[in-house]
Every structure is written in structure tokens, then in C-alpha cells.
UniProtKB/Swiss-Prot annotation:
Residues flagged as site, Important for catalytic activity: D175
Main subcellular location of this protein, as a coarse class: cytoplasm
Catalytic activity: Hydrolysis of terminal non-reducing N-acetyl-D-hexosamine residues in N-acetyl-beta-D-hexosaminides
Protein name, entry field: Beta-hexosaminidase
PROSITE patterns attached to this UniProt entry: GLYCOSYL_HYDROL_F3
Residue intervals passing through the bilayer: none
Species for this entry: Mannheimia succiniciproducens (strain KCTC 0769BP / MBEL55E)
Length: 347
């Protein structure tokens, strides 16, 4: 069963990387800034991956907008999610702009033959260093409206959506890239506020995937949400009725270290309810997992996991030349770049 998403070292596909990508446990890969030189190079890299690895691979990236945008030169400079509400006074225009940002981001990525950009961020608030202006808003209702519009744009471009970081990463000050954060707030606060964007968008059938946080919510469970049956099975699957894909966040992050070595982290995330696992920046860890992770031959959830994986591949795509000649792209690329520049100038 394919379950792992891995990364590449540089701007060309190495022979040993092609071999790893062909491993039965590998479902896909995630691209980073280090894999990018310019648009021609990244298109050539993706084409080479598709040609040399003889199976469907889910190719992903973090191209959220704002400070999390892996490809910049030659692409629209996408605005930070906070800028929609912070820089635009007209509520209707906020929603229109968010929708066009979602569409344009997804359309540019699918034009490269990338299937999925992990978006949108549904965390509330801007105090957490790891989140900051990646969050739409501090309040539930405007955050849900803006995220819903952004999602509509992504879906129009044929890209699946990933809500992150469940059940909410916005109110911890520690960065889970560097350590395991603890959220000390009462569980009632998390359920009344932080989980609401996920709950409401799941109810609206707008989330195709969810990525849990490497955060321990001390008054709810002793495990990080990414390795917690309570959060992923009892709450996400049972209470919220979510039937889409659950991605682990990067198991190479320091915040996942609470769960043990790389094999233990992978086992714990799968046991808790994750369908697909991200393991980045740890090439030796990837080899350890591929050599030692033991999966059931035909687990009862195998068919559901395969169905969920298939649903994440892009549904349609322009070529780059086709996309950049459309009126929608021409109008919105300029507007969105200008919005991001205004946002940066205001800070």
C-alpha cells in the first residue's frame, strides 16, 4: 500500500531518488524551493519524474501564498491569506479576491503537472510564529467565508483542497518545525473556536484532505494530533464525519519527535488514522521507513485509502501558455501581485 510522500535533494532527479520513488510504499513527493531554479527547469524536472518513475505519483508543493510560496520567479506573487481581510474593506471584494487567488494558485500549479498544493491554512489568529499571516483571520466566521471562497477557486482549477493544521495551530507560540508545542487552553475553547473552520467546511463538503498539527492539546489528549486516535478517529472521522484523506504533517519536523524514531512516527501516524505520510529533509529516515515499516497485506481500510489517494490527483489543467493567455489569469495575476506588495509595504 502506497503511503509515503518524500522529497528530492536538488534540481535534478538522481538515480537513487528515482529508485526510491518507484518503491511500493511511496505514493508521491513534495517539492521545495531547493528543487526550483526557474519555470523551465521545474517543468523539466516534473516531466523527468513522470517519465522515469513508471507509476502514478502524487506530486505536491506548499504554494499557499505570502511567505510560503516555493516557486516565485516567473510565477504570480500570491498574497498572504491575512491580506484579504486586512487590506480590502469591501466584504464582497474580499471573497472575490480570495476565490481568484485560490483559482490562480491552483491553475499555475496544475499547469506545471503538479497535482496538489497543501492549502488552505484554517488556523485562527496571527500570534503563532509558524502561522502568522498564513491565517485568514482571528475570528471564525470571516475565516470560514474567506477559506470557502479560496477553496471554490481551487476546485474550479481542478485541484483538491487540504485544510491545515487540524484542530488548530494558531494559538501556540512554539514552532512545531523546531519543537513539540503544547496548547494549554481548555478543550471547550478549542471546540468552540479553533475546530470550527474545519467542522463547518467539512459539513459543506469543501475539504478533500486534512492535515493535523504536531501539537499536543493537553486538556484533550496526551499525543500530538498527528498521532492521536482521539483527534483523527473519534473527532475528525466520527464526530465531524470526515471521509477524505488525512495527511500527516512532515514527520521529519522536530515537533514529531515526541512519537519516537522515523519508523515509530510513521507507525503511530498510520495507527492513529493518517492515510498518507510526509517525511521530508531526512533521506536516511526515508530509507529506514522503506526498509522497516510493516503494513498489513490487505488491511480493512485499504480500499478506502486507495480511493482517497486517487481523489487527490488533479482533475484538469491548462498548459502554461494556455493559462497565461486567459483573461482570468491576465487580470488576476496583476491584481494579486499588487495586493501582496501592498501588504508587504504596510508591515
Amino acid at each position: 500500500m502506497s503511503t509515503l510522500l518524500i522529497d528530492l535533494k536538488g534540481q535534478e532527479l538522481l538515480a537513487e531518488e528515482a529508485e526510491l520513488l518507484a518503491h511500493p510504499l511511496v505514493a508521491g513527493l513534495i517539492l521545495f524551493t531547493r528543487n526550483f531554479y526557474d519555470r523551465s527547469q521545474i517543468q523539466a524536472l516534473i516531466k523527468d519524474i513522470r517519465r522515469r518513475v513508471k507509476k502514478p505519483l502524487l506530486i505536491t508543493v506548499d504554494q499557499e501564498g505570502g511567505r510560503v510560496q516555493r516557486f516565485r520567479e516567473g510565477f504570480t506573487q500570491l498574497p498572504a491569506m491575512q491580506s484579504f481581510a486586512a487590506m480590502i474593506s469591501d466584504p464582497a471584494l474580499q471573497l472575490t479576491t480570495a476565490k481568484e487567488a485560490g483559482w490562480l494558485m491552483a491553475a499555475e500549479m496544475t499547469a506545471l503537472d503538479i497535482d496538489l498544493s497543501f492549502a488552505p491554512v484554517l488556523d485562527l489568529g496571527h500570534e503563532c510564529k509558524a502561522i502568522g499571516d498564513r491565517s485568514f483571520c482571528e475570528e471564525v466566521e470571516p475565516a470560514v467565508r474567506l477559506a470557502s471562497a479560496f477553496i471554490d477557486g481551487m476546485h474550479q482549477a481542478g485541484m483538491a483542497t487540504t485544510g491545515k493544521h487540524f484542530p488548530g495551530h494558531g494559538h501556540v507560540l512554539a514552532d512545531s518545525h523546531l519543537e513539540t508545542p503544547y496548547d494549554e487552553r481548555p478543550s471547550a475553547v478549542i471546540f468552540e473556536r479553533d475546530i470550527q473552520p474545519f467542522q463547518q467546511l467539512i459539513a459543506q463538503n469543501k475539504l478533500d484532505a486534512v492535515m493535523p498539527a504536531h501539537v499536543i492539546y493537553r486538556h484533550c489528549d496526551s499525543q500530538p494530533a498527528s498521532g492521536s486516535k482521539y483527534w483523527l478517529q473519534d473527532i475528525l472521522r466520527q464526530k465531524l464525519g470526515f471521509d477524505g484523506t488525512v495527511f500527516s504533517d512532515d514527520l521529519g519536523m522536530k515537533g514529531a519527535g515526541f512519537m519516537g524514531d522515523f519508523v515509530a512516527r510513521s507507525e503511530k501516524a498510520l495507527s492513529a488514522g493518517c492515510d498518507l505520510l510526509l517525511l521530508c529533509n531526512e533521506p536516511e529516515g526515508v530509507v529506514q521507513v522503506l526498509d522497516n515499516l510493516k503494513l498489513e497485506e490487505n488491511p480493512p481500510h485499504f480500499a478506502a485509502r486507495q480511493r482517497r489517494l486517487q481523489s487527490l490527483f488533479k482533475k484538469k489543467a491548462f498548459s502554461w501558455n494556455e493559462l497565461t493567455k486567459t483573461r482570468r489569469w491576465l487580470e488576476n495575476s496583476k491584481k494579486l501581485t499588487a495586493l501582496q506588495q501592498s501588504w508587504l509595504d504596510s508591515k
